[in-house]
Structure formats: C-alpha cells, structure tokens
Amino acid sequence: MEEIVIVGRHAVKEAIVSGHTINKILIQDTIKKGQINEILKLANSNKIIVQSVPKSKIDGLSDSPHQGVAAYIAPYEYADFDAFVAQQKAQDKLSTVLILDGLEDPHNLGSILRTADASGVDGVIIPKRRSVALTQTVAKASTGAIQHIPVMRVTNLANTIETLKDNGYWIVGTEAENSTDYREMDAGMPLGIVIGSEGQGMSRLVKEKCDFYINIPMVGHVNSLNASVAASLMMYEVFRKRNYIGDKA
C-alpha cells in the first residue's frame, strides 16, 4: 500500500483527529510518555499501531524537525471539484476559494493552507501541472491544516475558473498594473482569489478569466511579496470585510 510520512506532534495529532488513515505511529524511544500522552490516548482509542524506535530511525524519514513523533499515513486525497461547488451552493454563506496558479514551493503551499483554515477559506484549487502536490513537506508546513481544507487538483485551471464563474463566483487576480488597491475590494459575493507564481505571476489564460484585478501597495524598497504572504493578506482582507469585530465567523 502506498503511504507517505508525516512528522511532528501537532501534524500527527491532527491526522488522527481528522480521521485520516494512519498505518503506524513511530515514537522516539527517549521521549517521556507524559509529553505525548494525548497522541498515545488517541492512537489507543483508534486502534493505531504505535512503535518505539531510536531517534535515528525518525531522523532518516524526514529532514524536518519531528519532535520525536512520525506516522505512516495513506496519501492525501484531493477533494472533488464538482462536489465542492455543489456543496458550496447549498450553503447559506459567501464562499471563498483560493486559486493557486503555478505555485511550486511546498512550504508556501503549507503556509497558505494554514492561513486558509484560520481565515475561513472554503477550499484551495491547484493545477495538476506546474504545481506542487500535497506532500509531507506541505503537511508539516501546514501544521495540520491540510486535514481540514479541501484541496482540489484540476487539469485545466482556466476551464475550472469558467465553471466557478458559471456558479456565481467573481474571480479576482493579483496584478500590479491597472488594478485596484486590495483594501477597496468588494467581498460581498462569492470570490475566487487567484495567486500567481512568484516568478511568473498569473498565466495569460488565467489572467484573461479574471473579472477584476487588485494590488497590494508597497512603499518600501522591494517590489514583490512572498506568495504565501500575499495570499494571507488577501484572505484576511476578505475575512475583515465579512466579519465585524466581536462577531463569530
């Protein structure tokens, strides 16, 4: 059976809680049980195999800090796009989906998933080509958010955007030229927010599908932001516009 490895106490705990299929948990043999008591209880109640191993064993599984905990899990499953759209239409809320056009850095994707979960974004769309997939590096960087945010992997991003538009979404692209300050963005309708790659920005076909463009003003010496930072600003601007202070999102 194909499987991948995740490391870190929080990532492993979130995988158990979310119901993800876990084949085995590895615990560093020098870790005191009191430090991982919650994980051990969850593993026991879910009948998950737990194996005590030397630190070198876990070191060999990942270059990331692992806190003495790792797990072999089933591959991450991508959400079905058509089912996602139908589900969003059935809900009485303004939907937001993030569209990542050519993002290739797994740490950026993990960070974006983390912020998407925190800010109430409903789903993330990535293309099958020219894009990072859901890997253990993404899982680690997301600190467990990968278990909670639907990620859809599509063949044709431009066609997918057209389907979103047919279902009431307005598509907003991040673009420096001929665009509006993101603080003036209207968030009163279902939104698809496009984040282009750091090197190339949005592809031509995707850019042509956008309904309007926004920019993030910068007054310092640099002229660009990390993709995950730009995405975070956009997501929380939508959150700010839709949620008054003191209201529960």
From Swiss-Prot:
<dbReference type="InterPro" id="IPR001537">
    <property type="entry name" value="SpoU_MeTrfase"/>
</dbReference>
<feature type="binding site">
    <location>
        <position position="225"/>
    </location>
    <ligand>
        <name>S-adenosyl-L-methionine</name>
    </ligand>
</feature>
<dbReference type="InterPro" id="IPR029028">
    <property type="entry name" value="Alpha/beta_knot_MTases"/>
</dbReference>
<dbReference type="GO" id="GO:0032259">
    <property type="term" value="P:methylation"/>
</dbReference>
<dbReference type="InterPro" id="IPR029026">
    <property type="entry name" value="tRNA_m1G_MTases_N"/>
</dbReference>
<dbReference type="InterPro" id="IPR029064">
    <property type="entry name" value="Ribosomal_eL30-like_sf"/>
</dbReference>
<dbReference type="GO" id="GO:0008173">
    <property type="term" value="F:RNA methyltransferase activity"/>
</dbReference>
<feature type="binding site">
    <location>
        <position position="216"/>
    </location>
    <ligand>
        <name>S-adenosyl-L-methionine</name>
    </ligand>
</feature>
<dbReference type="GO" id="GO:0003723">
    <property type="term" value="F:RNA binding"/>
</dbReference>
<protein>
    <recommendedName>
        <fullName>Putative TrmH family tRNA/rRNA methyltransferase</fullName>
        <ecNumber>2.1.1.-</ecNumber>
    </recommendedName>
</protein>
<keyword id="KW-0808">Transferase</keyword>
<dbReference type="Pfam" id="PF00588">
    <property type="entry name" value="SpoU_methylase"/>
</dbReference>
<dbReference type="Pfam" id="PF08032">
    <property type="entry name" value="SpoU_sub_bind"/>
</dbReference>
<comment type="similarity">
    <text>Belongs to the class IV-like SAM-binding methyltransferase superfamily. RNA methyltransferase TrmH family.</text>
</comment>
<dbReference type="InterPro" id="IPR004441">
    <property type="entry name" value="rRNA_MeTrfase_TrmH"/>
</dbReference>
<dbReference type="InterPro" id="IPR013123">
    <property type="entry name" value="SpoU_subst-bd"/>
</dbReference>
<dbReference type="GO" id="GO:0006396">
    <property type="term" value="P:RNA processing"/>
</dbReference>
<keyword id="KW-0489">Methyltransferase</keyword>
<feature type="binding site">
    <location>
        <position position="196"/>
    </location>
    <ligand>
        <name>S-adenosyl-L-methionine</name>
    </ligand>
</feature>
<dbReference type="GO" id="GO:0005829">
    <property type="term" value="C:cytosol"/>
</dbReference>
